[in-house]
């Protein structure tokens, strides 16, 4: 199985300024992400950034980075530019590992790539784990996904789906036993042909209402398959508290 890992890393961040360069045990966070990705089965790991400082930080630690335009509306648009710059063929597979995931498990990267390889009818693969509890089911910040028997995604939502009519009658807030409720994990594998088409896809109503970019692909008829894993991976770094948690994890490993 051959695939490339691309790590989009945008320097601007409202909650954590200069996030890709934040120090984690002596190295920039984006470098820590690249190190984790390099432990996967990827043939190549490449950072795609909008800032020369990130590119230089990567180079200082022996990692490759490509400089992309600063005006991309999404990380997926940034990947589209990167695959063209790298000259990747349409049938190649790219795994998008976010630049704020310094604790990502290399095995998860491999599993998502393998899920796409096993589904030639699909353009995208992603990941999900069982919902932890009723609080997660009703939390709009926890994205849910429902799947067909063949692991094809049927819908992603911030709403509590699927709705267990009987268990939730009368306003109850419970996680019904056996409910096939899955917590979406935001790691993606793409076929390069899809990434090249993505910038031309118009944003649909479902994406606008849910504020979930993956719905754009589904609204345009693209198939997403979902790798199921038993438990949620470590969360990404979005806040100063998240950064301290990641630093502590690395300190404990060293």
Swiss-Prot record:
Alphabetical UniProt keywords: Cytoplasm, Lipopolysaccharide biosynthesis, Nucleotidyltransferase, Transferase
Matches recorded under CDD domains: CMP-KDO-Synthetase
The keyword Cytoplasm is annotated on this UniProt entry: yes
Assigned EC number: 2.7.7.38
One of the GO biological process terms: CMP-keto-3-deoxy-D-manno-octulosonic acid biosynthetic process
Cellular component annotations (GO), alphabetically ordered: cytosol
SUPFAM superfamilies, alphabetized: Nucleotide-diphospho-sugar transferases
A GO term for molecular function: 3-deoxy-manno-octulosonate cytidylyltransferase activity
Subcellular localization(s) per the UniProt record: Cytoplasm
InterPro entries: Cytidylyl_trans, KdsB, Nucleotide-diphossugar_trans
Main subcellular location: cytoplasm
Catalytic activity: 3-deoxy-alpha-D-manno-oct-2-ulosonate + CTP = CMP-3-deoxy-beta-D-manno-octulosonate + diphosphate
Class in the EC hierarchy, top level: transferase
Tagged with keyword Cytoplasm: yes
Protein origin, superkingdom: Bacteria
Pathway: Nucleotide-sugar biosynthesis; CMP-3-deoxy-D-manno-octulosonate biosynthesis; CMP-3-deoxy-D-manno-octulosonate from 3-deoxy-D-manno-octulosonate and CTP: step 1/1; Bacterial outer membrane biogenesis; lipopolysaccharide biosynthesis
Family membership: Belongs to the KdsB family.
HAMAP family: KdsB
Function: Activates KDO (a required 8-carbon sugar) for incorporation into bacterial lipopolysaccharide in Gram-negative bacteria.
Protein name per UniProt: 3-deoxy-manno-octulosonate cytidylyltransferase
Species name: Bordetella bronchiseptica (strain ATCC BAA-588 / NCTC 13252 / RB50) (Alcaligenes bronchisepticus)
Gene assigned in the entry: kdsB
